[in-house]
Amino acid sequence: MSGNMTFSERHLQEARQILDAIDIAPIDRMVSILAELRDAGGRLFFLGVGGSAGNCGHAVNDFRKIVGIEAYAPTDNVSELTARTNDEGWETVFVEWLKTSRLKPTDAVFIFSVGGGDMKKNVSANLVRALEYAKKVGAKVLGVVGRDGGYTARVGDAVAIVPTVNPETVTPHSEAFQAVIWHLLVSHPRLKIQQTKWESTH
């Protein structure tokens, strides 16, 4: 990579490299799983922390409104999230939320995460606990994650890994491509049932 590049040029070049390198196969598997989930009346639960939590709330809106899937994110309910964190601890906050939501085999858990969770390193242990429960219940596990994908990639049914092209920009690219991929999904002809406003004004 040229040392004469500006930061903006380098960042956008990295984004292009990621686009060229990303594996499409797990994304197409997500489409099939989500179509089957909707047909079966299943629900979709988005889990993430930090910037990924913000993406979860946005994705919930899109999957409900555009795709017609009943979707939720525990991080959208600040009162319950903080009560569980205060009373029970951060590590179990998502798994207990899924238990209260009566997670079923017809449902799916969708992870947005930079690292995918790693119990040994004590990174996003709350995601790992939630995924352990999801697998026990028999729910599908989807994800868009960075780095090596962590625990999410190891147990997931369809997990897109955002390739690392620069170790110093893993987080911004991982979170940006979460949005790229979920917008691809809600725009996919197998999933999209509601036209978005600006595309309907031609």
Can you say where each PLM-predicted feature lies in the sequence?
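Generic N-terminal amphipathic, Lys/Arg-enriched alpha-helix
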Residues: 1-22
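Glycine-rich, small/polar surface segments that engage phosphate groups of diverse ligands
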Residues: 35-108
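Gly/Ser/Thr-rich loops at beta-strand to alpha-helix junctions
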Residues: 49-54, 116-118, 149
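Glycine/threonine-rich flexible loop motifs
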Residues: 117-127
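Short alpha-helices
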Residues: 136, 145-198, 202
